[in-house]
Amino acid sequence: METKSKIISFIGLAKKAAKLSIGKDAAYESILENTAELILFSSDLSTRSMNDVEKVASKKNVKTLTTNISMSDYEQVLNKKAGIICIKDSGFAKKIQTLCEIQE
């Protein structure tokens, strides 16, 4: 299985485990509630949205990553179009982060 597919699979598992926040507002809320472990940005997310979330995440020491996965790819697994995904579980966050680093 290629790395991109593995990342998408882990995102799907995190969704089933209710360990995701999907979208900008949900990510903000998770960051401010200190439940965010990792923020993922889609490859086609606007720079403005990315910068807005990165500012808040950096203040709370939450890691952010831009993936090479598009919003439409995320939509297939989440059934919702989203460019910002917040992982709220440290195990899922570590595995996805490792896979993203391998992919680079």
Which stretches of residues belong to each language-model region?
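N-terminal first-folded block
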Residues: 5-38
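Short secondary-structure boundary segments
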Residues: 43, 68, 89
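N-terminal targeting/trafficking signals and adjacent low-complexity tails
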Residues: 1-4, 102
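Short glycine-enriched loop/turn motifs at secondary-structure junctions
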Residues: 14-15, 58-59, 77-80
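Structural motif
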Residues: 37-38, 63-65, 82-85
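Positively charged, polar, low-complexity stretches
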Residues: 25-30, 48-74, 100
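C-terminal structural segments of small proteins and small subunits
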Residues: 71-104
